[in-house]
Amino acid sequence: MRSQINISNLTINGMTQNANTDIGQNLQNSHTANSKNYGVNFTLGDYSPSHSIIISASCDNDTSDQGQVDNPSSPSEE
């Protein structure tokens, strides 16, 4: 079934660690982190432009911090 979601105003005051924002139908399986980004994104009011500083310079030998674990609730791919 096709759905349409209209969002006119969305305000998220803070997210940390392995946080995410989901809108609509979705399936998350084992929350795998394949990239590590450090930074900040901020605005000074509801109508001000957004400013961000993202630094992606980290030395980490393991690509994936959490393994790809099969979830029995996920739909089969047959």
From Swiss-Prot:
InterPro entries for this protein: Spore_germination_GerPA (IPR019618)
Pfam name, any one: gerPA
Region entry Disordered, spans: 57-78
Protein name, UniProt field: Uncharacterized protein YdzH
Species per Swiss-Prot/TrEMBL record: Bacillus subtilis (strain 168)
Chain's gene name: ydzH
